[in-house]
Amino acid sequence: MLDQQTIATIKSTIPLLAETGPALTAHFYQRMFHHNPELKDIFNMSNQRNGDQREALFNAICAYATHIENLPALLPAVERIAQKHASFNIQPEQYQIVGTHLLATLEEMFQPGQAVLDAWGKAYGVLANVFIQRESDIYQQSAGQNGGWHGIRPFRIVAKQPQSSLITSFTLEPVDGGPIAAFRPGQYLAVYIRDKRFEYQEIRQYSLTNEPNGRYYRIAVKRETMGSVSGYLHDVAREGDVIELAAPHGDFYLEVTPETPVALISAGVGQTPMLSMLHSLKNQQHQADIFWLHAAENTEVHAFADEIADVAATLPQLQSYVWYREASSEAARSAHAFHGLMALKDLPTPLPMTNLHCYLCGPVAFMQFAARQLLELGITESQIHYECFGPHKVI
């Protein structure tokens, strides 16, 4: 535990941190990658270039300083970050590297005095130990279950199938032929890529799109305009190739009783974790209403439409609707399609307010747009769960 003097010192630095903004974390990352370039094998350098990771770390530092007297308020964020760290196979000694560069950044930018540096050193040590312990537990749980493992494991691409003009799915089986770890519907796999085309190892997380079966995993990858790894998987990776995976991780997953109505709300490639949830609801013989609500630019980029239709044909309580921003005349005539932006108030059957749990995934602006509608309809914040692809943002 931190003493009151340390807490007071940390809180006194909040105005300075707020005034500096993400320039603080930009300096930190520049310093760390200069002195420890091996960490570029872990970090997504695309998120470094666009500033998303700098912003996410800055927000995390400010949140820690703000809630330094109420650390339980940070537990959801700790769990989300620990799950992501576990997918990167983060080790305890790497926290020491981060701590060294964090304190050096504070000294170089602010010259705040030894008392402030000592306080932040203590505070960082407490937080690092929380993460180290939680991640150790996650590693043990992953390795200890049937089919589980720690670190990375080679998998073969046994099927590669275009699902739309932008999204391709990959079915992956373990090279060793053994069983594979179960996962919670909504979780993701970390894919490790080493190739001469890349200066450093590249690690990306992709949501699982099938239900747990003990034999294979399926992911789906959207081709991003500037995406080096998505381009590699779309254009270079072939059936029969071997890639390495970490075990499934993630804090976004389906957690409802059979009597709980569920709304799966997505846009674009954000439907990938929802697919796993939907297949699991079907195979668990879910009893309550299920709403599949998806937004796509047009029919050309709309992935998995046939798969959803097949599920709907065998699941009477499923209501499936799609919104096309650039709808064709054929799509607009469909009884289950709308033209324009998603408007939840236009559903033929209103969403049930009582006990409905809503799962959201897609671009941040879309999730903010959908969440506002849900709140206006009477859904509470506790009924809304969401996943950000990339660094976390609050919707």
UniProtKB/Swiss-Prot annotation:
<keyword id="KW-0963">Cytoplasm</keyword>
<keyword id="KW-0408">Iron</keyword>
<dbReference type="GO" id="GO:0046872">
    <property type="term" value="F:metal ion binding"/>
</dbReference>
<dbReference type="GO" id="GO:0046210">
    <property type="term" value="P:nitric oxide catabolic process"/>
</dbReference>
<comment type="similarity">
    <text>In the C-terminal section; belongs to the flavoprotein pyridine nucleotide cytochrome reductase family.</text>
</comment>
<feature type="binding site" description="proximal binding residue">
    <location>
        <position position="85"/>
    </location>
    <ligand>
        <name>heme b</name>
    </ligand>
</feature>
<dbReference type="InterPro" id="IPR001433">
    <property type="entry name" value="OxRdtase_FAD/NAD-bd"/>
</dbReference>
<feature type="active site" description="Charge relay system">
    <location>
        <position position="135"/>
    </location>
</feature>
<dbReference type="Pfam" id="PF00042">
    <property type="entry name" value="Globin"/>
</dbReference>
<dbReference type="GO" id="GO:0071500">
    <property type="term" value="P:cellular response to nitrosative stress"/>
</dbReference>
<feature type="binding site">
    <location>
        <begin position="388"/>
        <end position="391"/>
    </location>
    <ligand>
        <name>FAD</name>
    </ligand>
</feature>
<keyword id="KW-0479">Metal-binding</keyword>
<keyword id="KW-0285">Flavoprotein</keyword>
<dbReference type="InterPro" id="IPR017938">
    <property type="entry name" value="Riboflavin_synthase-like_b-brl"/>
</dbReference>
<comment type="function">
    <text>Is involved in NO detoxification in an aerobic process, termed nitric oxide dioxygenase (NOD) reaction that utilizes O(2) and NAD(P)H to convert NO to nitrate, which protects the bacterium from various noxious nitrogen compounds. Therefore, plays a central role in the inducible response to nitrosative stress.</text>
</comment>
<feature type="domain" description="FAD-binding FR-type">
    <location>
        <begin position="150"/>
        <end position="255"/>
    </location>
</feature>
<keyword id="KW-0349">Heme</keyword>
<feature type="binding site">
    <location>
        <begin position="268"/>
        <end position="273"/>
    </location>
    <ligand>
        <name>NADP(+)</name>
    </ligand>
</feature>
<keyword id="KW-0274">FAD</keyword>
<feature type="site" description="Involved in heme-bound ligand stabilization and O-O bond activation">
    <location>
        <position position="29"/>
    </location>
</feature>
<dbReference type="InterPro" id="IPR023950">
    <property type="entry name" value="Hmp"/>
</dbReference>
<dbReference type="GO" id="GO:0005344">
    <property type="term" value="F:oxygen carrier activity"/>
</dbReference>
<feature type="binding site">
    <location>
        <begin position="204"/>
        <end position="207"/>
    </location>
    <ligand>
        <name>FAD</name>
    </ligand>
</feature>
<feature type="domain" description="Globin">
    <location>
        <begin position="1"/>
        <end position="136"/>
    </location>
</feature>
<feature type="region of interest" description="Reductase">
    <location>
        <begin position="147"/>
        <end position="395"/>
    </location>
</feature>
<dbReference type="GO" id="GO:0071949">
    <property type="term" value="F:FAD binding"/>
</dbReference>
<feature type="binding site">
    <location>
        <position position="188"/>
    </location>
    <ligand>
        <name>FAD</name>
    </ligand>
</feature>
<dbReference type="Pfam" id="PF00970">
    <property type="entry name" value="FAD_binding_6"/>
</dbReference>
<dbReference type="GO" id="GO:0008941">
    <property type="term" value="F:nitric oxide dioxygenase NAD(P)H activity"/>
</dbReference>
<dbReference type="InterPro" id="IPR017927">
    <property type="entry name" value="FAD-bd_FR_type"/>
</dbReference>
<feature type="active site" description="Charge relay system">
    <location>
        <position position="95"/>
    </location>
</feature>
<dbReference type="InterPro" id="IPR008333">
    <property type="entry name" value="Cbr1-like_FAD-bd_dom"/>
</dbReference>
<dbReference type="InterPro" id="IPR000971">
    <property type="entry name" value="Globin"/>
</dbReference>
<feature type="site" description="Influences the redox potential of the prosthetic heme and FAD groups">
    <location>
        <position position="84"/>
    </location>
</feature>
<dbReference type="InterPro" id="IPR001709">
    <property type="entry name" value="Flavoprot_Pyr_Nucl_cyt_Rdtase"/>
</dbReference>
<keyword id="KW-0560">Oxidoreductase</keyword>
<keyword id="KW-0561">Oxygen transport</keyword>
<dbReference type="GO" id="GO:0009636">
    <property type="term" value="P:response to toxic substance"/>
</dbReference>
<feature type="site" description="Influences the redox potential of the prosthetic heme and FAD groups">
    <location>
        <position position="387"/>
    </location>
</feature>
<dbReference type="GO" id="GO:0020037">
    <property type="term" value="F:heme binding"/>
</dbReference>
<dbReference type="GO" id="GO:0019825">
    <property type="term" value="F:oxygen binding"/>
</dbReference>
<keyword id="KW-0521">NADP</keyword>
